[in-house]
């Protein structure tokens, strides 16, 4: 094993994650490509082996919930950036078809190369803005699960993501230590966009003291036709 693979194996075990040797090898491929591409473009500020293993990969996998993922068939990662949390979830839940969506073409090129090198046959990469893609019939209300990490505060994030989720599906937002404030802020937006109550599942990462959380919103009814609003408006004028 390489030093990165050893760190990942140890930290994953500490987090209660059962990674296979093949999955660890896939993540090693991702790590190598992330480091190489990061020299050409700004994908992440965190490139040390411990940081990639814990703050990127294991953090992404905290979104996994067996009861939710077992029956799911489709997942979209909105504003995926460097493929987080979508790529780790695609590795860990290979039966789910994962769509990685990002507005920056260069990042989509990285994602496409990474998915191919990791032999992730359950991943497709799309270059699009969420506000525009969510109005297309092939994406609107088509996904069992939507995930997002480090994109926007919850009222804005809900506007970007809930239109993609089918009725009965779930949005999972990976949030930091201020998650309780965002949970309260997002209540009205969730109601407007067809979501139910916002639940919080606190999580801890191995080796770190801070508490994070997965905020979950179940889609209870269709998102009104007027949403998402035109490009840029969800962020400039969040729903309150």
Each language-model region and where it sits:
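Class I SAM-dependent transferase core
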Residues: 1-76, 106-123, 231
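Short loop/edge segments at beta-strand edges and connector loops
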Residues: 21, 47, 127-129, 199-201
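Conserved SAM/SAH cofactor-binding pocket of Class I
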Residues: 58-152, 158-161
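Conserved beta-strand segments of alpha/beta enzyme cores
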Residues: 97, 122-124, 170, 196-199
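Short strand-turn motif at the edge of the Rossmann-like AdoMet-binding core
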Residues: 103, 151, 174-178, 202
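Short alpha-helix immediately C-terminal to the canonical SAM-binding loop
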Residues: 107-109, 179, 183
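Short glycine-dipeptide loop
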Residues: 165-172
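SAM/dcSAM-binding transferase cores
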Residues: 184-240
């Amino acid at each position: 094993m390489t030093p990165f693979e050893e760190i990942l194996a140890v930290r994953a075990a500490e987090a209660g994650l059962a990674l296979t040797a093949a999955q660890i090898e896939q993540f090693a491929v991702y790590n190598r490509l992330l480091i190489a591409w990061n020299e050409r473009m700004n994908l992440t500020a965190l490139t040390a082996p411990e940081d990639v293993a814990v703050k990127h990969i294991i953090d992404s996998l905290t979104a996994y919930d067996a009861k939710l993922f077992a029956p799911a068939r489709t997942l979209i990662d909105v504003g995926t950036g460097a493929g987080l949390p979508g790529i780790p979830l695609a590795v860990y839940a290979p039966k789910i078809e994962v769509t990685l969506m990002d507005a920056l073409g260069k990042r989509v090129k990285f994602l496409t190369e990474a998915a191919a090198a990791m032999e992730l046959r359950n991943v497709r990469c799309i270059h699009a803005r969420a506000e525009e893609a969510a109005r297309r019939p092939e994406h609107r209300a088509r996904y069992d699960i939507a995930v997002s990490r480090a994109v926007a505060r919850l009222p804005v994030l809900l506007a970007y993501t809930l239109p993609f989720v089918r009725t009965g599906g779930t949005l999972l937002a990976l949030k930091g230590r201020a998650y309780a404030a965002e949970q309260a802020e997002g209540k009205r937006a969730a109601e407007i966009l067809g979501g139910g109550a916002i639940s919080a599942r606190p999580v801890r990462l191995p080796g770190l003291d801070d508490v994070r959380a997965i905020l979950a919103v179940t889609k209870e009814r269709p998102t009104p036709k007027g949403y998402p609003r035109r490009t840029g408006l969800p962020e400039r004028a969040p729903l309150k």
